[in-house]
């Protein structure tokens, strides 16, 4: 484990908010201001094909607040040299308040993705800023021993406890889809949960979820995501009935969701085994959920 005290001492609070780059600058600014007033100290920025560049989103957040900015996560495909250069530029303009999360990115071969991620972790391990690893498998979790911390791509205590067997690091965060219900963004929540689940091959095997995974493999999830981007409900779309059939399984195991009391309870439970919880997509999309952040920040 890296001997830097940075992540043991920095003050990002116990609850963070994820914001992605498919909102307008005005919408991002609105959510950042609400979150800061609610006591949230860090915004975690995701990377996704078709979204605004995460470094541009970081500039928007940093120039309009005093909050920490975490990248959760940047793909190793982005290039380790570029990551360092971009973050150093942000640090020059806005000070030492940036955390870099690294993930494998999209590769046809999981082994190739792991190899690229490992190379990037080795490249960044001596960076001047905190570095954490995005983890959803034993292999990626073990890489966090080389840096400052781990972002578990999971919000279920049982799954995180399994991954904890493969890591030993100063900072541990649970990062996953979240939403206060009821919400007009519930379909987005369901899709986010399905994406996390179907992308977790080792978890599926470990917890014997093969039957559910087999059914969900029949669904063109990205086609449904595009329907939501276009402002349409997925009800009636091909494959959506399979998703709805597994709603309870997906929401209970792969999201932090429910009424305010349930969301707060889930956060407090996760904080028994983690240092930090990130409320990820689609929480930030629902401005009503964002406005109730103060009720769930613990």
From Swiss-Prot:
Residues 1-26 form the signal peptide. One of its GO terms (molecular function) is oxidoreductase activity, acting on paired donors, with incorporation or reduction of molecular oxygen. Keywords: Signal. This is Uncharacterized protein AF_2023. It comes from Archaeoglobus fulgidus (strain ATCC 49558 / DSM 4304 / JCM 9628 / NBRC 100126 / VC-16). The lineage of its organism: Archaea, Methanobacteriati, Methanobacteriota, Archaeoglobi, Archaeoglobales.
